[in-house]
Amino acid sequence: FGTAKDFRRLVKQIHDLDMKIILDWVANHSSPDNVWLDQCRQHWYTLDSAGYLQPTLGTDWWDVADLNYNNPEMRKEMINSLSFWVKEFDVDGFRCDVADYVPTDFWVDARKELDQIKPVFMLAEAENPAHHDFAFEMSYAWEFHHIMNGLANGEKSLRDVHEYFRNNRFKPSDFRMQFTSNHDENSWNGTEHERYGDQRLMYAALAATIEGMPLIYSGQEADFNRRLKFFDKDEIDWGDFALVPFYTKLFQLNKNNQALWNGEHGGQVRFESSSD
């Protein structure tokens, strides 16, 4: 996967292009052969009644070991590990996997430490308003994503869209990430072609112009139509990057129109009623 020198060069090139880079961070669990276990730190993990490693309660993730956030040593080392990537490689933040499975007070503590190094950007793979109070700028808009899926298959209506915004639990300053696909959706629930059919670009436009920040998943700019294997390396056929012009225009529209900006900097969705 390259060397530390390679990665530093990548980060610099990204910054030279006036872009930011955040890393995926899985704080809830580790592999069962993690180096921490080699170092006899089994007490950093959640153990079953027989003293064995176990997955996170309520999941079927038998290929991972749940971490014990009641252990202050483990929490400290997790924060040290996050800090390492900011100090040593100048990354700009983290996308935090299953953030709801980790205590919110840990994220608050981690954010305080990271911001002492430099201001970072934190994305929670969760949909919890409390995360935005102290630790995260952005969270996944899963509920709206499922509404879009439901609109496409006829299970939802515009009334559901109206209800979603009327019952919004998030503050205007909270960034919400909007998307039509991601690594979970593609592998487990189907490609955009499967879920949206010929309307996939219309829903992509909706996700990019509704309140929030749009995500484009690997392969969308190539109109890639295959479920990627979740646990194995599975390469994308990029072809001629068929949808690059579409997404370029869409994101330019998002960038150049203040009404489409994120959080409190942009506009808010309003609904007009009519008797016609």
Language model features: what each stretch is:
Residues F1-F89, W107-Q116:
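Substrate-binding/active-site clefts of carbohydrate-active enzymes
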Residues R270-D276:
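Carbohydrate-binding surface patches
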Residues A204-A222:
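Conserved short secondary-structure transition element at the edge of the structured enzyme core
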Residues R200-M202:
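Conserved interdomain hinge at the start of the Helicase C-terminal
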Residues I21-L23, F94, M122-A124, Y140, ...:
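Hydrophobic faces of well-ordered beta-strands that scaffold small-molecule active sites
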Residues F1-A4, D60-K76, D92-Y101, F144-E155, ...:
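The substrate-binding groove and active-site-proximal loops of carbohydrate-active enzymes
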Residues F89-D92, G212:
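Short loop/turn motifs at secondary-structure junctions
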Residues H15, S81-S83, K87, D97-R176, ...:
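Active-site-proximal helices and loops of the catalytic beta/alpha 8
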